[in-house]
Amino acid sequence: MEIVKIINNNIVSALDDENKEIVVMGKGLGFHTKAGQKIPEERIEKIFRLNDESEIGKFKELLEAMPLEHIQTSVEIIDYAKSVLKRRINQNIYITLTDHINFAITRVKDGMEFPNPLLWEVKSFYPSEYLIGEYAIALIRKDLGIEFKTDEAASIALHIVNAEYDSDMSNTCLLYTSPSPRDGATS
């Protein structure tokens, strides 16, 4: 596997055996290296294969502009989600969730947190994904020192739901059988 482009000290793009572009992560992979050099297998921590060439481009741009710790934490959350759910999830989650988490961290640092109006529904209809969201905010607190409100667990859960069903945020539908108690509905 040869380096095509150095994204940062720990992330490079490369070509796999089928000559398809991949993104490779590993400690120091891009440090003091250049395009054309072989990647030592033992230094590879994670390989990202996205099906669409345009998605690879978006992912590389995202990785160039983001702190490594945000990327690593996002990857850990996604790996945890895969292990808990034991089902295939769309690889685009590496783009969507990583971007979301990075932006959410920026918002918290700027004092701009927003409530998630779907919190109750996400907890009710997607309990496994919501628990993964809770795991995610605990991990972010531990690894990055950022304190999110519980609403963020629901936002993260929705990204996971989208990846499970090969959907995007605009197409995510929640089953809604009755008004939530927060709506002030009476029987």
Predicted regions and their residues:
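Extracellular/lumenal glycan-associated surfaces
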Residues: 91-105, 151-165
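Intrinsic, low-complexity N-terminal interaction/targeting segments
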Residues: 124-134
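Short, recurring structural edge motifs at helix starts
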Residues: 78-89, 122, 137-147, 167
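Short, low-complexity cationic-aromatic patches
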Residues: 85-95, 128-129, 143-154
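A surface-exposed, charged beta-strand/loop segment in the N-terminal or early-internal portion
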Residues: 6-92
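Conserved small/polar residues in nucleotide/adenosyl-binding loops
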Residues: 176-183
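Extended intrinsically disordered, low-complexity coil regions enriched in Ser, Thr, Gly, Ala
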Residues: 91, 106-117, 169-172
